[in-house]
Amino acid sequence: MRYSLFKNYLPKEEVPEIRKELIKLALPAMGENVLQMLFGMADTAFLGHYSWKAMSGVGLSNQVFWVVQVVLIAASMGATVTIANAIGAGNRKAVRSLAWNSVFLAIFTGVILTALTPLSDVLINIFPNLEGEIESSAKEYLKVILSGSMGFSIMAVFSAMLRGAGDTRTPMIVTGLTNFLNIFLDYAMIFGKFGFPEMGVRGAAVATILSRFVGAGILTYVIFKREEFQLRKGLVPPKWSSQKEILRVGFPTAIENFVFSTGVLMFANILLIAGAEAYAGHRIGINVESLSFMPAFGISVAITTLVGRYNGMGNKEHVLGVIRQGWILSLLFQVTVGIIIFLFPEPLIRIFTSDPQIIEISKLPVKIIGLFQFFLAIDSTMNGALRGTGNTLPPMIITFISIWTARLPVAFVMVKYFQLGLLGAWIGMIADIIFRSTLKLLFFLSGKWEKRAVLTRERVKELG
């Protein structure tokens, strides 16, 4: 069966209620992403004013961290989708089993990531063209961040559990508290304020892991108090069928993120051909572009949660209604942000650097990315929709194809042979965005996602 984003599958009187549900879930998730963005901006701004080379090194180490945390992404996405479907199906026993097994997976992934700490130098050495301070900053930051992985793991999975239960407000509040703590500690530890020693890059990393452990403690208290998860009824032993379902749904998303993050690392190597200044401009451009991620992330989370819930109920009309209304909201928000980015690139870039050369090379690419928010709105909507129904494999395959046939080859040719520097690399990135979003949309419109949606619903029902 073929579908359309322009067709309303719901009775007109139900559309306002669906839109209200989406906004209710999306706004706190947007708020959480705003706070995450502010944390990223603060980190980048503090380090940018401390040393732009230190800022670039930290940017590289963060990309490596995103690559190595694939199991964490699997556990997080799997928890959100399976818990949402189980709640929609009204299966309390399945919800409890999935909740406990999500806790076990959070601890397991934290241990695995922490065990990678001794390999931090090896992981950074994949970049062959690094300069001295950039290389040393990247290695120092990654070593500290990996040592504190348990806090990241618990925060990510427990927040995902709450989103699956339809609570996006609590993760926002906890993220806000931890990020404001992080910003304070960043300033104090990077520059040596309020009695702290000046620690530079190490200070930024220590501030991050301390704040994440505080957040992990708060979220642990919250999920054990929540009635939906029934965790206080007693320990449920690890159950392979529940863990397998969480990972079956979440693992393709983890591989998708691994493929994307690996592509981003390759992309960074292409940028380093153009010079360290081009890479610094890229990091700043990504932070400016993150303004559009706020609405995209929030609405995508809301779509995943509601689609999962209605899929668990077996209500296809509401699944389609959520997807259509989510796309309309995403389009409205992201195009608005895109216009702002296009019209005012320089003031946004100056938040992160005062270096005239970096500002100049960043302006045009940032303006261009503002024009392509329409495609990013499609991409984020389709991600939320397909994941909510358990269709996590097709986005993974599409991302792999798009990264390796559009982003990387186009960027390499533009940078290496046309000498276009940062602009050339971002032409490759835009080609990837257009190709990826179009393929995901075509898959949704074809109706081929329905079989997996039914399978996800039936498997969750069996977990009780």
Curated annotation (Swiss-Prot):
One example of a Gene Ontology biological process annotation: monoatomic ion transport
Subcellular location(s) per record: Cell membrane
Coiled-coil regions listed: none
Topology of this chain in the membrane: Multi-pass membrane protein
GO molecular function: antiporter activity; xenobiotic transmembrane transporter activity
A UniProt-annotated Pfam family: MatE
Alphabetical UniProt keywords: Antiport, Cell membrane, Ion transport, Membrane, Transmembrane, Transmembrane helix, Transport
Annotated Gene Ontology cellular component terms: plasma membrane
InterPro entries in UniProt: MATE_fam (IPR002528), MATE_MdtK (IPR050222), MdtK-like (IPR048279)
TM helices/strands, residue ranges: 22-42, 64-84, 104-124, 142-162, 172-192, 204-224, 258-278, 288-308, 326-346, 358-378, 384-404, 410-430
Function: Multidrug efflux pump.
Family the UniProt entry places it in: Belongs to the multi antimicrobial extrusion (MATE) (TC 2.A.66.1) family.
Protein name as annotated: Probable multidrug resistance protein NorM
Organism listed in the record: Thermotoga maritima (strain ATCC 43589 / DSM 3109 / JCM 10099 / NBRC 100826 / MSB8)
